[in-house]
Amino acid sequence: MTILAGARKPVLLVEGDGDTHAVPFLIRKVAESSGLHDLVPCSNPIKCGEIPKLRKQGQLERFVQYACQRNDGDSVVLVVDCDDDCPVLTSVEFTARVREIAERYSKKVGIAFIHKEFETVFLFSLLELSLKYPEHGWRLNNDDNTRDWSTVRGAKGELNRRMKNYSYKETRDQVKFVSAIDVDNLTSTCRSALHLQRLIDWLYSDSTNFLVYPTLTHG
């Protein structure tokens, strides 16, 4: 099988219901910020569940193989929450498990974790959210723009505490809040977003030196 170097139509593996719309939107926003306007994820992302489920024997491989077999995509991207797991060590584990599948189908397979959860991205974007949706009555602090939100557990709860007039609901608000994100600001402060941007650049590139991303090894 001929390897398609520069991928444009990734099949997405996502965690839950809200992610099926929010993750493709975020990927498109990040790609467009890099000028990659023709990178458009396939419709109907595959819900694969959380990391503990994917860690079970054969589960990760089953989902990645299913995504590789879809005729509407030229690549695969997994985007799930990392919660309290180490994103680097989990990336090493997962890329090792899917490498053979990527080579068998000659498709690029990228893995991206949101540390700690998808809503953590919104905590890095509180100012932008407050400007786009002022009616929610945002409570902002002076250190919001410099704080490392990836160390904070319970991002959904923190998000709710920041709004006086609104209650966050994942399936209703994920896409809405993604629309407020400034990608350049986000990638300069949030390592998960920067990793996603680099993954998208790798996916789009003509390089076929590696069919899995990130290209991590132990040690």
Segments (PLM) and residue ranges:
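C-terminal accessory helical subdomains adjacent to catalytic cores in phosphodiester-
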Residues: 2-9, 20-49, 57-219
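Short hydrophobic beta-strand that contains or immediately precedes a catalytic carboxylate
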Residues: 12-15
